[in-house]
Amino acid sequence: MELTVLTRSAHPPGRRLPSWLKRPLPSGDFARTVEVVERSGVATVCQEARCPNLSECWSKRHATFMILGDKCTRRCHYCAVETARPDPTAKDEPERLAAAVEKLQLRHVVITAVARDDLDDEGAGHFARCVTAIHGRCPATTVEVLPADFHARRECIEALCEAGPELYNHNLEMVERLTPRIRPQGKYRRSLEVLRTVREIAPSMLTKSGVMVGLGETTEELHQAFRDLREVDCDVLTVGQYLQPTRDRHAPVEKFYTPGEFDELGAYARSLGFLSVASGPFVRSSYNAAEVFEESRRRARGSERNRG
């Protein structure tokens, strides 16, 4: 059976979803993952952002955890996460998160967070404590962090890097021209500066970024974004189709890219020297994150600059 991925989302009026944007119904360990997540009391971006890969990933016991609450201080016109005054930070969240990772027996975990512009350190310290808790309880588990930009504050980025995540992921999200309109509280150049700063602070740490397509960008603009990421020595790139969370509050889908077009974008990105590139309709920042991480680490160990 097939399940249309936008069962809780909208898409442009009069525009039918392409055949490749269909997914099988959940199976395997889906129910087990649901149970562990619900009992732990931790949030996942899989649910909050209405990710189309939820069924597939949860069936494989893959989950991306979202810390620092489920309310964001920023409003981006592509994101399904609620914008509101955030709740106080839960001090026991790092341990609850680590317990969930242990129960799910994850070999690689992705932690993301809402933007917390209301906090003095924008949540960097709490983020670092979550990484430390997971490493303490699950020493064999590798940790990938996907934070907001911290306004590119070096002390915040440094605090998180010092916790020792194996991979630092920060998304560029879209091409530069579209950023002011669709991501008004973010800045394209600031996101590049975040990745540059990570490389300066932790030269051996893998870095990663993601770009959405279908918002009205041109191919040359995408190529420029990929080149900009390589200029700050970004190691890993993900490229995926933007899907409109709601009809009335989010930017419309301007184009559904074909699998062939994703292959072409991926080929161009690989020609620039990324260690790993994932490009496809369902690709998201954390999609197949464990496999992408292992591929990147293996290639990094074989390169001149050993990041192992």
Where do the language-model regions lie?
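Alpha-helix N-cap/helix-start and coil->helix boundary motif
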Residues: 73, 175-176, 244, 284
